[in-house]
A protein has these predicted regions:
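Residue-level detector of short, conserved catalytic/binding motifs and their immediate flanks
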Residues: 12, 241, 318
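C-terminal motif of bacterial Sec signal peptides marking the signal peptidase cleavage site
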Residues: 15-18
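Secondary-structure boundary elements
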Residues: 148-204
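Conserved structured core elements
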Residues: 4, 13, 212-213
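Bacterial N-terminal signal peptides that target proteins for export
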Residues: 1-9
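Hydrophobic/aromatic-rich core segments of domains that either
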Residues: 214-277
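Flexible, surface-exposed loop/gating regions in the mature catalytic domains
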Residues: 191-225, 242
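N-terminal accessory/pre-domain segments preceding catalytic cores
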Residues: 20-172, 284-416
Length: 416
């Protein structure tokens, strides 16, 4: 069924639960009549085919699970859930050994779990895991200091807990949560060839990545936390890595490192791609999967959003806001439940980002920073009569530069 429709900001409706409001020390609330929503000028209607989108299933409250089994290996013959949980518990405690009595695991399963833990190294200090003569596990670390092991493990657990709390509000759909976590990785992990090689710990605690596998492995770990099936895939030479995620039986490519390199992760141009599209984006026509199962990605998730120079997610509202549709600039809302598109503001947005329950954008006409509330379409200046030259979201912060600042200092609007 096809629908044609176009609406103004006054008609914006979004069902939103559990979304924190942003805190802005410099933001000034203006009288209701100070800033009027710009009138919508006649323009061609947006024609969209309305359909259910993959991953529309709603999530409850997401709780960090350190021993969640990676979905890429959950059903394989080279992984043991019980063994993995037992080893994770010991490593997080900084123990030198793990009692494996009662654990039935083949050599192939032991090797599979060992390789996974060594390549991911979430808790930062693991050196190796081997079986001893009694069939238990001997664990060695990069430090002899047990307290340091425990401290680093706690730092990682705390970082992931905070990340999930901020990025995945209760009521998010699987898809909106997956997009939100993708944005976190693309916006907050920076490539640094000198970064300490401790994999997930380095990426999610320190925000540093040596290479693309750090991005892909971090995103994979976070997707497993929200129950989204996924796998890390590698280029033929093994030098580059990205993710394939599966929602409702349909698989898509996601490349957070390429996204980060384009504009600091401010768009969604590399999320939800088909096989043909990923080859265009990162240059790799063939790849292999970490679990030796190659999934076909036959179609794109939302091509219109991918083509916009700026796009951001309202995870709780299960929507994406983006800045360009069919060659026409504006502030648009893509419903992640059914694919419907709504024009929220008929303006020329210089840049766009979502923080909490507000969509922020710079109006090219007056260079002012506006915020449009997603719950009711209320439109105001975010900073009273202060021209702004640039904005970008990094995690739970909106960073902006005022137009008259010769030093281009970044100011911050943050979540409560």
């Amino acid at each position: 069924m096809k629908k044609r429709w176009l609406a103004s900001a006054i008609a914006l409706w979004v069902l939103l639960t559990g979304c924190s409001a942003p805190h802005v020390q410099l933001e000034t609330e203006l009288p209701e009549d100070t800033v009027q929503a710009p009138e919508i000028t006649p323009s061609p209607e947006i024609e969209q085919e309305v359909q259910m989108i993959s991953g529309s299933e709603k999530l409850g409250s997401v709780t960090y699970r350190p021993d969640v089994v990676p979905s890429a290996f959950a059903d394989g013959e080279k992984f043991s859930q019980e063994l993995y949980s037992r080893l994770v518990e010991a490593i997080r405690q900084g123990a030198d050994a793990a009692d494996l009595s009662g654990v039935e695991a083949t050599e192939a399963q032991f090797d599979g779990v060992r390789v996974f833990l060594l390549t991911r190294n979430p808790w930062g200090t693991l050196n190796d895991v081997v079986r001893d003569a009694d069939g238990n596990a001997k664990i060695t670390y990069t430090t002899a200091d047990v307290q340091e092991r425990v401290t680093k493990a706690a730092e990682f657990d705390d970082a992931v807990t905070r990340l999930l709390d901020a990025a995945v509000p209760e009521g998010s759909s699987q898809l909106s949560a997956a997009i939100s976590l993708y944005k976190v990785v693309a916006q907050t992990v920076q490539q640094d060839n000198e970064a300490q090689d401790c994999r997930l710990y380095s990426a999610l605690v320190q925000g540093l990545a040596q290479d693309s596998s750090f991005y892909a492995e971090s995103y994979s770990f976070l997707l497993d936390q929200i129950g989204v099936e996924n796998a890390v895939v590698f280029s033929e030479d093994g030098e580059y890595a990205w993710n394939v995620l599966t929602l409702d039986g349909q698989s898509y490519h996601c490349d957070a490192q390429t996204e980060a390199g384009l504009d600091g992760g401010q768009a969604l141009s590399c999320f939800g791609l088909s096989d043909a599209q990923i080859a265009e984006k990162n240059g790799w026509n063939t790849w292999r999967s970490e679990n030796e199962t190659l999934l076909q990605c036959s179609k794109s998730l939302f091509e219109a959003v991918q083509q916009a120079p700026y796009a951001d997610v309202d995870a709780a509202g299960c929507a994406v806001y983006f800045s360009k549709m069919e060659g026409r600039e504006g502030v648009f809302r893509y419903d992640l439940n059914n694919g419907e598109v709504l024009e929220v503001q008929s303006v020329l947005p210089k840049q766009l980002a979502v923080l909490g329950e507000n969509v922020y954008f710079i109006n090219q006409d007056d260079q002012m920073l506006y915020r449009c509330r997603t719950t009711d379409g209320d439109l105001r200046q975010a900073l009273e009569n202060v021209p702004v030259s640039a904005i970008r979201r990094v995690g739970s912060e909106l960073r902006y530069v005022t137009a008259d600042d010769p030093d281009q200092t970044e100011n911050v609007i943050s979540m409560d």
